């Protein structure tokens, strides 16, 4: 399946993003709970702050996009370490690849970042172009339905070593619509 058709039952979440302290806009993202419910729910709870550790909400608010590669993808979600090494999930540890039904067939698709088979956690990336070589390796679980320009603004931030943005790219606010 190239891209899932929108479904009224699927949750829609949002990221408000700032670059270098300046708000640049909002991305609205449909989560494909109808195709990959466990993966979508993990992401949704990190957007809303519903998941708590020791009574404290944990999730994407205040975290960064720590890796940006123009014409490929923008990666974020490491609210543990902020550098791409952190792993957390609502399932207490890394979780399995749910399925690979959806493909990396277009820009604006949300997919799980991982370090090999069944190592999903909190990190994700958003495709900036078709990335079919990732099919069967990373779980696609959502798509930007509004705010593709915000993704393009992030994609064009200057980067340094390890594709780290030279300006902080921060999820200043997030939640469910």
Swiss-Prot record:
Q: What is the protein name stated in its UniProt record?
A: Peptidyl-prolyl cis-trans isomerase H
Q: Which family does it belong to?
A: Belongs to the cyclophilin-type PPIase family. PPIase H subfamily.
List residues modified as N-acetylalanine. Answer: 2
Looking at the keywords, is Nucleus present? yes
For whether the record's keyword set contains Cell inner membrane, the answer is no
Activity regulation as described: Inhibited by cyclosporin A.
- Give, as one word, the top-level EC class: isomerase
Could you mention a single GO BP entry for this protein?
Answer: protein folding
* GO molecular function annotations of the record: cyclosporin A binding; peptidyl-prolyl cis-trans isomerase activity; ribonucleoprotein complex binding
The role this protein plays is: PPIase that catalyzes the cis-trans isomerization of proline imidic peptide bonds in oligopeptides and may therefore assist protein folding. Participates in pre-mRNA splicing. May play a role in the assembly of the U4/U5/U6 tri-snRNP complex, one of the building blocks of the spliceosome. May act as a chaperone.
Recorded catalytic reaction(s): these are:
[protein]-peptidylproline (omega=180) = [protein]-peptidylproline (omega=0)
Name the InterPro entries for this protein.
Cyclophilin-like_dom_sf (IPR029000), Cyclophilin-type_PPIase (IPR024936), Cyclophilin-type_PPIase_CS (IPR020892), Cyclophilin-type_PPIase_dom (IPR002130)
Give the source's domain of life in one word: Eukaryota
Protein's cellular compartments: Nucleus speckle; Cytoplasm
SUPFAM superfamilies assigned: Cyclophilin-like
Its Enzyme Commission number(s) read 5.2.1.8
Assembly mode: Interacts directly with PRPF4. Part of a heteromeric complex containing PPIH, PRPF3 and PRPF4 that is stable in the absence of RNA. Component of the U4/U6-U5 tri-snRNP complex composed of the U4, U6 and U5 snRNAs and at least PRPF3, PRPF4, PRPF6, PRPF8, PRPF31, SNRNP200, TXNL4A, SNRNP40, DDX23, CD2BP2, PPIH, SNU13, EFTUD2, SART1 and USP39. Heterodimer with PRPF18.
Q: Residue ranges of the PPIase cyclophilin-type domain?
A: 14-176
| Outcome of substituting residue 133 to F | Abolishes inhibition by cyclosporin A
Pfam families cross-referenced by the UniProt entry = Pro_isomerase (PF00160)
Q: Name one GO cellular component term.
A: spliceosomal complex
Major localisation: nucleus
Tell me the keywords, alphabetical order.
Acetylation, Chaperone, Cytoplasm, Isomerase, mRNA processing, mRNA splicing, Nucleus, Rotamase, Spliceosome
């Amino acid at each position: 399946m190239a891209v899932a058709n929108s479904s009224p039952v699927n949750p829609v979440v949002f990221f408000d993003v700032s670059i270098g302290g300046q708000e640049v806009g909002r991305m609205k993202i449909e989560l494909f709970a109808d195709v990959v419910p466990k993966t979508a729910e993990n992401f949704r709870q990190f957007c809303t702050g519903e998941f708590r550790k020791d009574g404290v909400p944990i999730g994407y608010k205040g975290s960064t996009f720590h890796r940006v590669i123009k014409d490929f993808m923008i990666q974020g979600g490491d609210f543990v370490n902020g550098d791409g090494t952190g792993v957390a999930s609502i399932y207490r540890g890394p979780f399995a690849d749910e399925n690979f039904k959806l493909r990396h067939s277009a820009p604006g698709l949300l997919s799980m970042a991982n370090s090999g088979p069944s190592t999903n956690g909190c990190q994700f990336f958003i495709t900036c172009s078709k990335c079919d070589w990732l099919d069967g390796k990373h779980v696609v679980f959502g798509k930007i339905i509004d705010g593709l320009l915000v993704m393009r603004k992030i994609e064009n931030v200057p980067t340094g070593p390890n594709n780290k943005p030279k300006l902080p790219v921060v999820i200043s606010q997030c939640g469910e619509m």
